[in-house]
Curated annotation (Swiss-Prot):
This is Glucose-6-phosphate isomerase. SUPFAM superfamilies: SIS domain. It comes from Edwardsiella ictaluri (strain 93-146). Its main location: cytoplasm. It is found in: Cytoplasm. PANTHER family: GLUCOSE-6-PHOSPHATE ISOMERASE (PTHR11469:SF1). Pathway: Carbohydrate biosynthesis; gluconeogenesis; Carbohydrate degradation; glycolysis; D-glyceraldehyde 3-phosphate and glycerone phosphate from D-glucose: step 2/4.
Length: 549
């Protein structure tokens, strides 16, 4: 990849000038001036997904200039480099090939001259065989009973992705009950184990190195709980499997290495649900549905790799995001799924985006002089409407929003889905067009109120509008369409990282806190006052020790 400071490009300078023209333009006027605006600023993908980006503060010239920025920063060269297996994660000297995990075309993808697809396919075949045995009841616990519950023990990418997908695809789940334990807080594992029978529980320990502090602490607590009932350590192998690459540590734990599912250093944690880390997904919805998830993502991969910039959906969404973040000064983006099954989707891409692009040093090692990754947050609709939409509508912060909804509900209960989707459509309309003072006064007049009677309340009922949104309407949330949607956001993040000249696939920002925690932990084990830190940290530790004594 080329290292190009985006602010030094001619395209960036042109965008700054263009922003001066666009910053006060209202969407009401953009729509009034062009009856075909929706058709020009929307696209349907694979007859499964409609992406409407017409309710943004952009025009055709905006998109042309943003695409010029993508070309000038060599986005297409970077896309080709990723798909070719080049080591674009330079700080860790690694390729970035989550796209290989879902390469349903099975075309060769090489790293260091070696095609990775035979190994990918071998692990998938092993996952399929394992899933069939567990789901069909062939896999038996130490007392001969079939498995009823599966506990995924992981953290970060080893937890957020599988948990999000199994929740999103609950309509496809089988008889197995899934549980996810991530937090090192003992409450998480303790509350989970209270509900389980050791005779019928299978644990998946998800840690590439098998040394992750939170994961291994929880795994050992689960093992201790299991052995209190089972007694014999040989039974561990019937109730624990590993998603790891550390053969020695897995064997030492008591897991049969035949039940160790590997992945590779070119799989980043937050992009790993497509790998063996997704075993909990495959166990929950069945391997055939897991393959459909991979297939949907692969369809979006092919689109991203081949579509011209003006039609490339991940690229368009990424460029619009850069427009708001760097020119309008928007600091956050909200992801708002109007589907309760998708309740963890915002949290998943909170990690996906913020861990990828939350960087202030560029690919040349220089501190940036522009904005990189935004803050990502969100909640399912309509809950959010009764919590934080007030600020989105009438606050002083500009918050671009992605609204996501399925046309077809898995639970067509009465008129619930119609009411849900009426809110979905209404919110984007209200955010875009608002309500003028004249409209408010007219509304009061129709209710028989005079201008004098209502003048004190009118300002509070005015909505400025001009608040940007993207609407992503899915035909139905299926494994295939969910795979497409996840890959859409993954490639949006990649695109922004390339253009903003940062490394999106490392996460050095999580290391310092870990190092300090490892230093502090031994200091908590005795009653001696701590004086080795700053005054605040010393005081906090010493109060903790005093209260715990």
């Amino acid at each position: 990849m080329k290292n190009i400071n985006p602010t030094r490009t001619a395209a960036w300078q042109a965008l700054q000038q263009h922003f001066g023209q666009m910053k006060s333009v209202h969407m009401r006027d953009l729509f009034a001036a062009d009856a075909d605006r929706f058709s020009k600023f929307s696209a349907t993908f694979d007859d499964q997904m409609l992406v409407d980006y017409s309710k943004n503060r952009i025009n055709a010239e905006t998109l042309e200039k943003l695409q010029a920025l993508a070309r000038e920063t060599d986005l297409q060269g970077a896309i080709a480099a990723m798909f070719a297996g080049e080591k674009i994660n330079r700080t860790e000297d690694r390729a970035v090939l989550h796209i290989a995990l879902r390469n349903r075309s099975n075309t060769p993808i090489c790293v260091d001259g070696k095609d990775v697809m035979p190994e990918v396919n071998a692990v998938l075949a092993k996952m399929k065989q394992f899933c069939v045995r567990v789901i069909d009841g062939e896999w038996r616990g130490y007392t001969g009973k079939a498995i009823t519950d599966v506990v995924n023990i992981g953290i970060g990418g080893s937890d957020l992705g599988p948990y999000m997908v199994t929740e999103a695809l609950r309509p496809y789940k089988n008889h197995l009950t899934m549980h996810f334990v991530s937090n090192v807080d003992g409450t998480h594992i303790a509350e989970t184990l209270q509900r389980l029978n050791p005779e019928t529980t299978l644990f998946l320990v998800a840690s590439k190195t098998f040394t992750t502090q939170e994961t291994m602490t929880n795994a050992h607590s689960a093992r201790d709980w299991f052995l209190q009932a089972a007694g014999d350590e040989r039974h561990v192998a019937r109730h624990f499997a590993a998603l790891s690459t550390n053969v020695q540590a897995v064997a030492a734990f008591g897991i049969d290495t035949a039940n160790m599912f590997e992945f590779w250093d070119w799989v980043g944690g937050r992009y790993s649900l497509w790998s063996a880390i997704g075993l909990s997904i495959a166990l929950s919805i069945g391997y055939d549905n897991f393959e459909q998830l991979l297939a949907g993502a692969h369809a979006m991969d092919r689109h991203f790799a081949s579509a011209p910039l003006p039609q490339n959906l991940p690229v368009l969404l990424a460029l619009i995001g850069i427009w708001y973040n760097n020119f309008f000064g928007a600091e956050t983006e909200a992801i708002l799924p109007y589907d309760q099954y998708m309740h963890r989707f915002p949290a998943y891409f909170q990690q996906g985006n913020m861990e990828s692009n939350g960087k202030y040093v560029d690919r040349d090692g220089q501190v940036v002089d522009y904005q990189t990754g935004p803050i990502i947050w969100g909640e399912p609709g309509t809950n959010g409407q009764h919590a934080f939409y007030q600020l989105i509508h009438q606050g002083t912060k500009l918050i671009p929003c992605d609204f996501i909804a399925p046309a077809i509900s898995h639970n067509p209960l009465g008129d619930h889905h119609g009411k849900l989707l009426s809110n979905f459509f209404a919110q984007t309309e209200a955010l875009a067009f608002g309500k003028s003072r004249e409209a408010v006064e007219e509304e009061f007049a129709k209710a028989g109120k005079s201008a004098a009677e209502v003048q004190h309340i009118v300002p509070f009922k005015v909505f400025e509008g001009n608040r940007p949104t993207n609407s992503i309407l899915l035909r139905e949330i299926t494994p295939y369409s969910l795979g497409m949607l996840i890959a859409l956001y993954e490639h949006k993040i990649f695109t922004q990282g390339v253009i903003l000249n940062i490394f999106s696939f490392d996460q050095w920002g999580v290391e310092l806190g870990k190092q300090l925690a490892n230093r502090i932990l031994p200091e908590l084990e005795d009653a001696q006052p701590v004086r080795s830190h700053d005054s605040s940290t010393n005081a906090l530790i010493n109060r903790f020790k005093a209260w715990r004594a």
